[in-house]
């Protein structure tokens, strides 16, 4: 035998599973681009002064099986107590048909945000269903397709209230004293940067306060009390005060819709509809508002439109509100939402339907009534007479009760003076209620569930008659058909087939890093040890989570060159916001709070200026030179002009133009010279890992898109994770939390997310990726990502000019193809090429970002040479088709490009085009055919005729 045992053990086996091209394919591509090796190619492209001498020490790679075993041992340290803590988080029963066919299905979780609606009709339909659930339960006119979490939704509601308020001089926002504490925490953080004063008081005292533009009430208070705010809301509306109401989605099944009571905005968490607690997330928030406020709403909105043939089709509506277009004037900086989680909640509602949901809600309420009756029968007092699922129980021996609860492996809410909180949920059984009787009353309580049930069934007064819903919900056919598992399975599959995800083809979106989300990485997120923990459980019950998070943070520190990492931000946009707040608070700590100017290159992603605006900064744009790099002369001039008011610069590296700028260190030095901080956007970290690092380059803070570089899937538009890495001087200024002390962080800052560790339950994905790749694999992944991009650029540059290149004519991990000359010559646009790619079985590259009239391509390291060649061949074939238009063979108004994409129905319809059906749907011998279900969307029609609820089922099936 010539191989050693170590070689046969092959601990680095996963590296070859993750990286698409094998060694032979890599060498072929290296030959094609004129480089001898990966190291030689990297050496040519990356500036020498920022190349790391040694790779970060994150350990050797592990096999999939070894890594899973190691993580399972860590997860086993978590203690799975039954949690009745509530506070917006409850245990759930995720229907197995949804678990298997959506959450564990790459056809759903590997898709991208539906910017290309023709390849996204399935999840757009599921999101439209989510909006319909929201509309029915809230009683309002317009709903979004999810926000990041309930607390973030509250902050967005405050910001929206100010935007639509007619009280322009009012600057105070009132929050009822019984909202969830984590909600208040995030609202306060946002209010500080906007300059709003937050008033917290009993809701009935709101009218005592002057100069209030908006009010936040909670329909079911944090300790369980149901409020009838009808009269109060009417009085507030008479004073032109915008009213927002936080609501419990399961309670809304039984309770009066806040919209019917006059609320302007209603929001809450959809977690109870089938999404595990997961130590805090990810969870989708729902958000609804009156129709008159629709253009001021944050987040995605799915609308019903028409395609080119006049058929009903769905799309993301009113995108001109969003950050990628309006930049600092956007309604919100949100880029990622929580699509996968919203779709789970949506399908939970479809599967159970109105009858099933009412049964679940009534069962929860009945068990709560039984628990209340038994406790009161034995002399215990309840703080509130009206409740849905949560009791606030006064106890004389609170310490004894909590001790008995711990012995029974039960968590009660313990932060209420002289009382405990108990929140029941859909997993609660009669046996659980008997156990709670024993904890609160002792084992000899003598209570009987059936006897108590008869009592409360005939005389339940715990929901005020005026608060009981009197209208029907979820009457649309989609919520009343798919209740057998067979029907549900087929419905979900029919939606999946309409979409294009990574399980069918590469998604070469520039700046999005649509790499492999390996099965081994995904497996741990459904382990009950991770899925079932309450985010506010005692820390000793979450030792496994703490170990995993600490280890992941340590690896990220080493990979970024920073000194600390904060895991709280639950999206890249939230990470930007948190990082900028750290800079702001750092300056304030040095009595330099006047520093509020943020320099942003003209090429920046739209979230950058939107986040800067949210952080209370003024945006000053820095020009780029003819090569697409930051103009150093303009940078110096702008920095000098800002002077003592310079707060920071936000820069992406490699640049959004797909180039390693040679002067990046000089950029950092100029900003530091004038007292500013350097925020390095982590969007393109996939071209840095193992090769260089933000800290080594000279940056002070970055967010990391774990849903790009570190393999968390995009989920069709979320979830994401955007933890921030910081240098030591900024560490005291990262987000904290009002409920949970974050170990190792000395920060006293407010929170940016509802949960202390953001979407903690998806962090195992990134842990697994780093553990299986090791230092060697991570560097190689970056190098192959660079190789793949240069291979595409070199093969396509004669057909489609590459707009920007660096030294030696190379690109980084992505390249921009300039379509503008072709459009001038032929009239064929980047949009036509993008839609024609669908006929070839591909998702389009990023269109018109960062430069209008271009396509930005990022292949990632996970795509094999075979797939790259398939894409290249498709692009070259499209170029040949453009030449046919140029030569007059096909007219500009009727050719395969302007009519793309083509659908199956066209094959059997009358055919009057100057090209054949075969050219239309099987171009260049396409073998593995993806069939879109709609033709090109009519965007103008969709925005002019905004309709954001379910249409008759016959129209989109």
Curated annotation (Swiss-Prot):
NCBIfam families membership: gcvP (TIGR00461), PRK04366.1 (NF003346)
GO cellular component: cytosol; glycine cleavage complex
GO molecular function terms noted in the UniProt entry: glycine binding; glycine dehydrogenase (decarboxylating) activity; pyridoxal phosphate binding
Catalyzed reaction equations: N(6)-[(R)-lipoyl]-L-lysyl-[glycine-cleavage complex H protein] + glycine + H(+) = N(6)-[(R)-S(8)-aminomethyldihydrolipoyl]-L-lysyl-[glycine-cleavage complex H protein] + CO2
Gene3D superfamilies: Aspartate Aminotransferase, domain 1, Type I PLP-dependent aspartate aminotransferase-like (Major domain)
UniProt superkingdom: Bacteria
Pfam families the record matches: GcvP2_C, GDC-P
Membrane-spanning ranges: none
Protein name (database record): Glycine dehydrogenase (decarboxylating)
Job description of the protein: The glycine cleavage system catalyzes the degradation of glycine. The P protein binds the alpha-amino group of glycine through its pyridoxal phosphate cofactor; CO(2) is released and the remaining methylamine moiety is then transferred to the lipoamide cofactor of the H protein.
Organism (species): Escherichia coli O9:H4 (strain HS)
HAMAP family the record matches: GcvP (MF_00711)
InterPro entries in UniProt: GcvP, GDC-P_C, GDC-P_N, GDC_P, PyrdxlP-dep_Trfase, PyrdxlP-dep_Trfase_major, PyrdxlP-dep_Trfase_small
Source lineage: Bacteria, Pseudomonadati, Pseudomonadota, Gammaproteobacteria, Enterobacterales
């Amino acid at each position: 035998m010539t191989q050693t045992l170590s070689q046969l053990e092959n601990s680095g086996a996963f590296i070859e599973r993750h990286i698409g091209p094998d060694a032979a394919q890599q060498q072929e591509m290296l030959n094609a681009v004129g480089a001898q090796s990966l190291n030689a190619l990297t050496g040519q492209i990356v500036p020498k002064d920022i190349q790391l001498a040694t790779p970060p020490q994150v350990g050797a790679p592990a096999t999939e099986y070894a890594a899973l075993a190691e993580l399972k041992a860590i997860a086993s340290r978590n203690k799975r107590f039954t949690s009745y803590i509530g506070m917006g988080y409850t245990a759930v029963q995720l229907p197995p048909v949804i678990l298997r066919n959506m959450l564990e299905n790459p056809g759903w979780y590997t898709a991208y945000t539906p910017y290309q609606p023709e390849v996204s009709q399935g999840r757009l339909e599921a999101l439209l269903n989510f909006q319909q659930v929201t509309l029915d339960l809230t009683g309002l006119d317009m709903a979004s397709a999810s926000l990041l979490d309930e607390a973030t939704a509250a902050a967005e509601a405050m910001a929206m209230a100010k935007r639509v308020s007619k009280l322009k001089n009012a600057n105070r926002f009132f929050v009822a004293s019984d909202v969830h504490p984590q909600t208040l925490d995030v609202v306060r953080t946002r209010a500080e940067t906007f300059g709003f004063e937050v008033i917290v008081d009993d809701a009935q005292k709101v009218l005592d306060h002057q100069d209030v533009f908006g009010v936040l009430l909670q329909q079911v208070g944090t300790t369980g009390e149901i409020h009838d705010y009808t009269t109060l809301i009417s009085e507030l509306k008479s004073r032109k005060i915008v009213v927002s109401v936080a609501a419990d989605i399961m309670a809304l099944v039984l309770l009066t819709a806040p919209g019917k009571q006059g609320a302007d905005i209603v929001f809450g968490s959809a977690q109870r509809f089938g999404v595990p607690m997961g130590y805090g997330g990810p969870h989708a928030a729902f958000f609804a508002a009156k129709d008159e406020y629709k253009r001021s709403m944050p987040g995605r909105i799915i609308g019903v439109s028409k395609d080119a043939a006049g058929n009903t089709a769905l799309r993301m509506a009113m995108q001109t509100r969003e950050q990628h277009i309006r930049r600092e004037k956007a309604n919100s900086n949100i880029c990622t939402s929580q699509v996968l989680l919203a779709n789970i909640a949506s399908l939970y509602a479809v599967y159970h339907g109105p009858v099933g949901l009412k049964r679940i809600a009534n069962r929860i309420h009945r068990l709560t009534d039984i628990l209340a009756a038994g406790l009161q029968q034995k002399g215990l007092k309840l703080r509130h007479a009206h409740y849905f699922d949560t009791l606030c129980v006064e106890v004389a021996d609170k310490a004894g009760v909590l001790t008995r609860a711990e012995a029974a492996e039960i968590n009660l809410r313990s932060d209420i003076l002289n009382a405990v909180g108990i929140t029941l949920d859909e997993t609660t059984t009669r046996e659980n209620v008997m156990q709670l009787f024993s904890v609160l009353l002792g084992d000899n309580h003598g209570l009987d569930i059936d006897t108590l049930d008869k009592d409360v069934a005939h005389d339940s007064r715990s929901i005020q008659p005026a608060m009981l819903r009197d209208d029907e919900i979820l009457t649309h056919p989609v919520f009343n058909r798919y209740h057998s598992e067979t029907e549900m399975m087929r419905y979900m599959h029919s939606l999946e087939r309409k979409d294009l995800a990574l399980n069918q083809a590469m998604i070469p979106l520039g700046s999005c890093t649509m790499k492999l989300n390996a099965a081994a990485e995904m497996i741990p997120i459904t382990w009950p040890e991770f899925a079932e923990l309450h985010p506010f459980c005692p820390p000793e019950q979450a030792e496994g989570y703490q170990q995993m998070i600490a280890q992941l943070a340590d690896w990220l520190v080493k990979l970024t060159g920073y000194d600390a990492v904060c895991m709280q931000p639950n999206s890249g946009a939230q990470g930007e916001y948190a990082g900028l707040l750290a800079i702001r608070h750092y300056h304030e700590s040095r009595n330099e709070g006047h520093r509020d100017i943020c320099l942003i290159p003209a090429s920046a992603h739209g979230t950058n200026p939107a986040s800067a605006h949210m952080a209370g900064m003024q945006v000053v744009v820095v020009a780029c030179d003819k090569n697409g790099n930051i103009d150093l002369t303009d940078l110096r001039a702008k920095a000098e002009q800002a002077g003592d008011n310079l707060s920071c610069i936000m820069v992406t590296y490699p640049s959004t133009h797909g180039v390693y700028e040679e002067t990046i260190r000089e950029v950092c030095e100029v900003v530091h010279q004038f007292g500013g901080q350097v925020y390095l956007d982590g969007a393109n970290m996939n071209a840095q890992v193992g090769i260089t690092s933000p800290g080594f380059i000279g940056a002070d803070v970055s967010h990391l898109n774990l849903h790009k570089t570190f393999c968390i899937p995009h989920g069709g538009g979320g979830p994401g994770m955007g933890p921030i890495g910081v240098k030591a001087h900024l560490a005291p200024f990262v987000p904290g939390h009002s409920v949970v002390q974050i170990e190792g962080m000395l920060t006293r800052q407010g929170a940016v997310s509802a949960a202390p560790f953001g979407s903690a339950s998806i962090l195992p994905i990134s842990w697994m990726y780093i553990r299986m790749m090791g230092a060697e694999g991570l560097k190689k992944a970056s190098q192959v990502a660079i190789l793949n991009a240069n291979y595409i650029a070199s093969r396509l540059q004669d057909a489609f000019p590459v707009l920007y290149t660096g030294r030696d004519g190379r690109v980084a991990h992505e390249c921009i193809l300039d379509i503008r000359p072709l459009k001038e010559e032929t009239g064929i646009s980047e949009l036509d090429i993008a839609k024609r790619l669908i006929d070839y079985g591909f998702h389009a590259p990023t269109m018109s970002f960062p430069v209008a009239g271009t396509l930005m391509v990022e292949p990632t390291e996970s795509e094999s040479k075979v797939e790259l060649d398939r894409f290249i061949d498709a692009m070259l074939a499209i170029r040949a088709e453009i030449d046919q238009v140029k030569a007059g063979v096909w007219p500009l108004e009727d050719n395969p490009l302007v009519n793309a994409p083509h659908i199956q129905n066209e094959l059997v319809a009358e055919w009057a085009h100057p090209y054949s059906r075969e050219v239309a749907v099987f171009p260049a011998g396409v073998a593995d055919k993806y069939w879109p279900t709609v033709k090109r969307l009519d965007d103008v029609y969709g925005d002019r005729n905004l309709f954001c609820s379910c249409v008759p089922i016959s129209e989109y099936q």
